[in-house]
Amino acid sequence: MKKRVYIETTVVSYFAARPSRDIIVASHQEATRDLWPDLTAEYETYISALVYEEAGKGDPDQAKMRLAAIEPFPMLDIDDEARFLAEKIIAGRGIPADYPEDALHIAVAAVNGMEVVVTRNFAHLNNPFTRRAVRRIVEGEGYVCPEICSPQELLEVDK
C-alpha cells in the first residue's frame, strides 16, 4: 500500500521555479525535481485547496507552471475540522500566529490521514522545535501527526 503524502506549496514552487544560480538553492531545486516522479509512482500524493490557491499567485507564467505541476494530484478539502485544528496549532504555539496558512497545511494533512507532509518551509514547518510542538498539539487533539520532512529526506527513504 502506498504511503499518503501531502505536498505543501514551497515544494511546488521549487519544482517549477527557474533554475537558480545560487548553488544551494539549485541543489534544493534538483532534489525536488528528483522526487517529483516518485510523487505519482511511489506515493498517494495530495494537495489542498490552499496549495492550489498559493500556487496560482505571483508571476502568471510561473503560476501556470505550478498549477500544471499539481494538476494530477487529488485536492483535499479544507473543512471546519481542519480549521479548528489549525487554530489549536496556533493557540498551542506550534506555528506562529502570523502564519495561519502553515498551520492549516498541517491540519488538513492530519485530519485527512496523511502520513507525511513534504515542505521546504524550514522557518515555520520543518525544524525540530516546530515538529515537536506540532506533534504534541496534533496528537493531543486525537489525530496522528504526519511526519514533516523535506524532499531530500523523502528521497532518502526511497533508497
For every predicted segment, state its role.
Residues 1-47, 54-67, 73, 91-97, ...:
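Short, well-structured N-terminal submotif of metal-dependent ribonuclease cores
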Residues 73-133, 155:
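Active-site neighborhoods of divalent-metal-dependent phosphate/nucleic-acid chemistry enzymes
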Residues 2-4, 18-22, 26, 110-159:
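Acidic, PIN/NYN-like endoribonuclease modules and their adjacent C-terminal/linker elements
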Residues 35-36, 107-108, 138:
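Short, flexible, glycine/charge-rich loop motifs used to bind or transfer phosphoryl groups or to couple energy/partner
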Residues 46, 76-77, 147-149:
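General small-molecule cofactor/ligand-binding pocket signal
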Residues 31-32, 102-103, 144:
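Short, charged/polar low-complexity linear motifs in solvent-exposed/disordered segments
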Residues 49, 79, 152:
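Residues at the C-termini of beta-strands that transition into short coil/loop
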Residues 9, 49, 120-122:
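Short secondary-structure boundary segments
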